[in-house]
Regions:
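Active-site loop segments of alpha/beta catalytic cores
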Residues: 1-31, 68, 77, 99-324
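A common structural microfeature
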Residues: 18-20, 47, 64
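Cofactor-binding catalytic cores of oxidoreductases
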Residues: 23, 56, 69, 90
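Short, surface-exposed, low-complexity cationic segments
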Residues: 30, 78-100
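Glycine-rich loop at the start of a catalytic domain that most often binds anionic cofactors/ligands
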Residues: 32-41, 64-68
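Catalytic domains of carbohydrate-active enzymes, especially glycoside hydrolases
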Residues: 39-55, 161-167
Length: 324
């Protein structure tokens, strides 16, 4: 069984030979560890091939604190290698919306397609500003509906461009949760955002690809909705939810891309704690038709010994059938 077959079988609950794994690393970690981290990745290869890419990669690794992206959003970072935050919002004033121009699509002649479906909630935040957007959603302004639809239309073009390259999956990323709740009421999410996501997910499935969705924070309330509208592989933030409860919601319904606790265990835990965390994750999410992909985000504060322990544990405990 090759890596591609292994991942597809995990997503489609068709019994892979082991838990497939993927590398998820912040540029700041690569800056800190360099070749030592690359060596770990060679020892424990990803089943996804090429890892994550960043459009602002050169800026992330530079000493410049300010960056203006192709959307006109102004980013500031405090530390090299970390994403930073958007501080300048091109549509902070709705008057600017009338003349705002969406960016041109990437030139497909560049030959490298990431398989990204983009973001929706976060893109709207960056364009309007977080507080402005929440006010818009609560008051139901006409412009915020138009903005949502324009962002979706743009993302649909990106999705179609990616599908032309025959990718296996399209990834979406929107951080919807705080530590213990959704950022907006679930009812508002269902009314305003759920139909928009469905438009994009339907396009992915029409093109024969899987839908991958990432969200940080507590999102338990909307996981059944995400599954209903077509998410095939879900990457939630484990440290914000009860894993046993999450397992009951996801088991047999959606493949889970793990998030080994990056708030405590990966950066500050012992090697044994990392191994036990991986073992627990496999027992909860890998036991039902093997719908699990192994992952843990590697930041600059994660010791190399814990990175090795995580991948070794997935290799050791993730062979199917699972040992009780």
């Amino acid at each position: 069984m090759n890596s591609r077959e292994r991942v597809i079988r995990a997503i489609e609950f068709e019994a892979p030979d082991r838990v497939p794994v993927t590398h998820s690393v912040l540029p700041a970690a690569l800056m800190r560890y360099g070749e030592k981290l690359e060596r770990v990745f060679r020892d424990y290869p990803s089943d996804f091939g090429t890892g994550y890419t960043y459009t602002q990669y050169e800026w992330l690794l530079s000493g410049r604190k300010r960056y203006v992206d192709e959307w006109g959003c102004v980013w500031f970072k405090e530390q090299k290698g970390l994403m930073g935050q958007v501080k300048g919002h091109p549509i902070a004033d709705w008057k600017a919306f009338e003349t705002y121009r969406f960016p041109t699509l990437p030139d497909k002649r560049l030959g490298y397609v990431t398989g990204s479906g983009g973001s929706l909630f976060e893109r709207m935040q960056w364009l309007r500003g977080f507080k402005n957007l929440l006010k818009d959603l609560m008051t139901g302004r006409r412009e915020v509906i138009l903005l949502r639809d324009k962002v979706v239309d743009y993302n649909l073009q990106v999705i179609r461009r990616s599908l032309e390259s025959k990718v296996d999956g399209i990834g979406f990323s929107d951080d919807w949760g705080t530590q213990d709740r959704l950022m907006i009421k679930p009812s508002l999410w269902r009314e305003f955002y759920k139909p928009a996501y469905k438009r994009m997910f339907d396009e992915v499935h029409k093109g024969g690809a899987h839908v991958h969705f990432h969200s940080d924070g507590y999102i338990m309330d909307i996981i059944p909705d995400l599954v209903e509208i077509g998410v095939d592989a879900l990457n939630p933030q484990f440290s914000c939810m009860n894993l046993e409860a999450l397992g009951k919601v996801c088991a047999g319904k959606v493949c889970v891309v793990s998030d080994i606790d990056r708030q405590r265990i990966l950066p500050f835990g012992s090697v044994e704690e990392v191994r036990e965390s991986v073992k627990r994750v496999i027992s909860i999410f890998g036991s039902y038709n093997r719908g699990l992909i192994g992952r843990g985000e590697i930041g600059p504060d994660v010791p190399l010994k814990n990175v090795k322990a995580m991948f070794q544990a997935f290799k050791e405990y993730g062979k199917y059938p699972l040992t009780p």
